[in-house]
Amino acid sequence: MPRTAAVDADLRDPAAVLGNQDLRAVIDPGRPVCVILGAVVHFLDPQAACVVTAGYVSLMAPGSCLVLSCARFEDEELAKQLAEEYTAATWYNHSPADIVSFFDGLELAGPGVTEARTWPKWPPAADDRNGHVLAGVGRVPGT
């Protein structure tokens, strides 16, 4: 039996993603899983990002983890330029408080929601003047 599945669904629809029958054939939804939202929430407005992350968390078994990373620019002018240049999709420069809110109801691991490069074993940044990635790991409370 294959242990992988490709899911063709809208990321913004957690029920469609996690309810996909091909996925359920390889992942038991009653057991802890890890959902990784790497470098995607900055394409969702803050309200939608909260709804989407909460949707995934609501469908995850206790002990599951949500891993999330989000690009963040301190320089608002640079962020605006990036948003204007990025024409394939709308890009949002979420505030650190927005990003922390995506973990509401979860137990934060490690250093919490912080710059990804500050996590253990992260390679040193070549140039961090323009922006960075905020990241965190949250665990669904329970067993």
Report residues per predicted region:
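Alpha-helical subdomain
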Residues: 1-143
